[in-house]
Amino acid sequence: LVIDLTGMDIANASLLDEATAAAEAVGLAQRVTKNNSKKIFVSETCNPQTINLIKTRIEPFGLELIVGNQKDFLKSEKSELICGVIAYPDTLGDIADPSEAISQIRKKGGKAIVICDLLSLAKLKTPAELGADIAVGNAQRFGVPMGYGGPHAAFFATKEEFKRSMPGRIIGVSVDRFGKKAYRLSLQTREQHIRRDKATSNICTAQALLAIVSAAYAIYHGPKGILNIANRTSKLAKLFADKIKIAGYELHSDNFFDTVTVKTKDKTDEIYRKAIAEKVNLRKINNQIISVAFDEAKRLDHVNLLLKIFGVKEVINKSTDVKLENIPQELLRSSKYLTHPVFNKYHSETEMMRYLKKLEDSDIALNRSMIALGSCTMKLNATAEMIPISWKEFSLPHPFVPINQMKGYQILFNDLIKDLKEITGFDAVSLQPNSGAQGEYAGLMTIRAFHKNNNESNRDVCLIPNSAHGTNPASAQMSGMKVVVVNCDENGNIDLEDLKNKSKKYSKDLAALMVTYPSTHGVFEEKIIEICNIIHTNGGQVYMDGANLNALVGIAKPGKFGPDVCHINLHKTFCIPHGGGGPGMGPIACAKHLEEFLPTHHHLQNSKLTKGVGSVSAAPWGSASILVISWMYIKMMGSKGLKLASQISILNANYISKKLSEKYKVLYTGKNGNVAHECIIDIRPIKEKTGITEEDIAKRLIDYGYHAPTMSWPVSGTIMIEPTESENLEEINKFCNALLNIKDEIDKIDSGSFEKKDNPMINAPHTYLELSSDEWKHSYSRQEAAFPKKYLKDHKYWAPVARVDNVYGDRNLVCSCPSMDEYKDEAA
């Protein structure tokens, strides 16, 4: 979808919002641009939220942000640039040919970043055709409600040559061991979980679920439907513009797609008041100009209401044929898009339903079995919690409507903030960060602003344990901090002596310690209070990664045992669905002395946060509509229920730890022999003895109907298991028995009962095509391959593909839909 509409070579699997996508594009440009420039140009006609977020992002690196008129600046500027960011169409709806600006940016050695509207690209020439290096934007209008700010998927597309510098997840095509096409995460060595502070971004959670919705929207409508929607939207804008001009108004531009900006002059305030009285929100640019945007959901009666508001008496009785001369002829698109059969096949609700069901059947999701991903907290997302997100009161509002119209939302925000403060023991909360990694970044930027306010800008060293999430060092780097790694001891705790030595060594420059509690090793850090005291004694602040908060809620409050700020993964502890990689929300909670430095936003004109770090998300409250899920969870559970959930999550993890310790080595426990809410199983002794790896075990679990646990993190050669409180004893026993049975299979390899080069472990997962083939080439039986436990005969999950060739996928990177010819070859 994104590759076709932008014309670029490669696209990632989504980003958080348009503003952060633009900031990530600036980051890519900085990585790949060969000159020594410190200058970044952003056109003043970009959206204000985008300009402000880019300003926040580049500030720690001493780069110069120039916001101005793109024509004048690019013509007069003689020095080199890192990049130039331009909008197409721009924030006022104007469509100007950006090719000259793109050419000027590239002549100055910079990369040309074009922020574009995905629907308009059904009508307009692609950014690629105009010479852009990077295209970004928001896919919200492809089937996703506004949601008072989100969630919706941003997109990021660029040239093939920049693929190894791209931010975010990339889904690529590979093959399984039979040569069948398979999808996988590609080029992961760019990402934070591997490259840490050298990663291309700190992205972990993005907006995968919303990207799927937008892709499904395009599949359902197809190229003809998308073009019809684009034409209808533009037609309404043109009808309005024509009548306005006849009535004597002057337009800001006659070239537009869906946004008409009118020079209202001395009538501005009167028109704006009339609009509010009619429950219509218009964008008042200043005292002279009002901007009107049409979307795909508007109708002719909306146009007539607008004409009435603008004092135009004539009514349009029917949608007459209108020539869409509002798009310059030279910018009209001629290239084809969405030509793949998947976009041209499923255009009835029946067929679309069956196609989506077919895709669902390929997944191991929580509606099928327990997902034991360590450090992910894959708990139940209860239906009652999620119903309100479908209500129009939550789903329809625009993020920049007047705040006095959103009293219900404000009550919800304040209520949630109050609850999160009570749960964490902190004094203030910002709901703006729209992922856990963004929460980390926001928290560290808040600490940075605190030090700067104390005239200690030199404090830029961030101590991070070697067990930390990869997002920690990546976020520290984004905040302009230098990462210094602290060792852990043999029990999984922070090495206190190493921490003392490094805190003392860097005491003059120490900004922060990032610590996860309970630790990523699955144990409660026994000396957490002393650890915090060491940092404070040496002038630093303590950032607590709240990834494992599910083991603390109702039991202990981070704000009371030492940390100064933490983020809260609402998509983990507080029940927002993970969505296969988003949406998420990562609010931050902090102590009183950091409150005034929390993120601000240009929409909040009366904010008390005068020293705030600027915006970290496009919308003031991030992905606001999904906050209702966490609100519902907290209210339904109550304080006793929240505490019980934490207790059961710890109990379940310890039950699994004890049960699996019969045949596996549990790597870390506390001094009492217990774990926190997750446990790490050491596979290294097994590999040393039999050659079987953690990946083999993860693949074999698929044959048993289970999603893989977290592999090789935080310790290489291990698997990490987190059951959450949502699983009952029957399901936990079933999962444990699957792993114990797998250990028996491994023992059979060791004893010679299974061949080392042909056994159920190294050939897993087994597909129904292999099981149903006329010829069975293995030394073990079909029964041993596919039905190692009796329950599988009643309800069996079949992997859609066999073992995937990871090396092939990275060496032969393909990130667009494979042609249908290849599928035909497979079936032949």
Task: Annotate the PLM regions.
Residues 1, 15, 87, 91, ...:
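Short acidic-aromatic active-site loops that bind/stabilize oxyanions
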Residues 4-23, 420-445:
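Short loop-beta-helix segment that forms the pyridoxal 5′-phosphate
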Residues 4-5, 178, 193-204, 211-429, ...:
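Non-catalytic terminal extensions of PLP-dependent enzymes
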Residues 11, 64-68, 252, 283, ...:
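General small-molecule cofactor/ligand-binding pocket signal
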Residues 12, 42-44, 86-88, 294-296, ...:
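Short glycine-centered, acidic/aromatic-flanked micro-motifs in structured strand/loop junctions
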Residues 20-32, 36-182, 244, 261-262, ...:
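Conserved PLP-enzyme active-site core in the AAT-like
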Residues 26-34, 209-219, 626, 630-634:
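Proline/glycine-anchored alpha-helix kink/cap motifs
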Residues 144-157, 161-162, 206-210, 298, ...:
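Conserved phosphate/anionic-ligand binding catalytic regions in large, soluble enzymes, centered on
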